[in-house]
Amino acid sequence: MITVKNIRKAFKDLVVLDGIDLEVKRGEVVAIIGPSGSGKSTLLRCLNLLERPDQGLIEIGEAKLNAEKFTRKEAHRLRQQTAMVFQNYNLFKNKTALQNITEALIVAQHKPRDEAKRIGMEILKQVGLEHKADSYPITMSGGQQQRIGIARALAVNPHAILLDEPTSALDPELVTGVLQVIKSIAEKQTTMIIVTHEMAFAKEVADQVIFMADGHIIEQGTPEELFDHPKNERTKRFIKQVGEPAELI
């Protein structure tokens, strides 16, 4: 489904990703945790070329790309395999919730407007916001805007959804609603890679958890393996510092 081999990314002299290898199976949910500056978000952005890796191989679905040399067509095909959910929502302020969802369906996938609207309304219902179809982002809470961002990603039916700290910009009382939407999507066997600082959420929802630090994958395993029985000392220190994951409400 997703295979990443020897991905490296540096910003001038600062190495952010150093030889990252990763495999994600179809229908699997992978949570990436770690301290700030560990390269988590950069890894996600490299997967859909929002950041161009300096080297390495990326394979998502039927799209393959060599980071050192690729064509515009190869880049376009790789980007089509994923949809991104950003921490700051990235909605079009001048478009309604429904229009934000249907934009990519009409412009990128060339679907008829009636079909795009039907898909958009189905997805809005899935995230519990069908009553907000004609509302603009300015009239919605941060949690509602993020759910629209998730709906937009779902609508294009990607091979995988990449979520970059989807709750980090939300007020605490809005976090649970967004996490519950993501959990419901995970239960439908949607392939997802989630960068998160919500440890309880990662433990409950993920099939695999990856701990990153200093541009490396330090340890990975099932939630039980990584949170309850970490092997690496760096992982143990991190888990101790952030606290044991509580149960997701």
Curated annotation (Swiss-Prot):
Topological relation to the membrane, as annotated: Peripheral membrane protein
All residue ranges annotated as the ABC transporter domain in the record: 2-239
UniProt xrefs under CDD domains: ABC_HisP_GlnQ
SMART domains reported in the protein's UniProt record: AAA
Location of this chain's protein in the cell: Cell membrane
UniProt keyword terms in alphabetical order: Amino-acid transport, ATP-binding, Cell membrane, Membrane, Nucleotide-binding, Translocase, Transport
EC numbers on record: 7.4.2.-
Residues that bind ATP: G34, P35, S36, G37, S38, G39, K40, S41
GO molecular function list: ABC-type amino acid transporter activity; ATP binding; ATP hydrolysis activity
Keyword Disulfide bond among UniProt keywords: no
Lineage: superkingdom: Bacteria
Principal place of residence: membrane
Keyword GTP-binding: no
Record family assignment: Belongs to the ABC transporter superfamily.
Function: Probably part of the ABC transporter complex YxeMNO that could be involved in amino-acid import. May transport S-methylcysteine. Responsible for energy coupling to the transport system.
Subunit relationships: The complex is composed of two ATP-binding proteins (YxeO), two transmembrane proteins (YxeN) and a solute-binding protein (YxeM).
Name recorded for this polypeptide: Probable amino-acid import ATP-binding protein YxeO
Organism: Bacillus subtilis (strain 168)
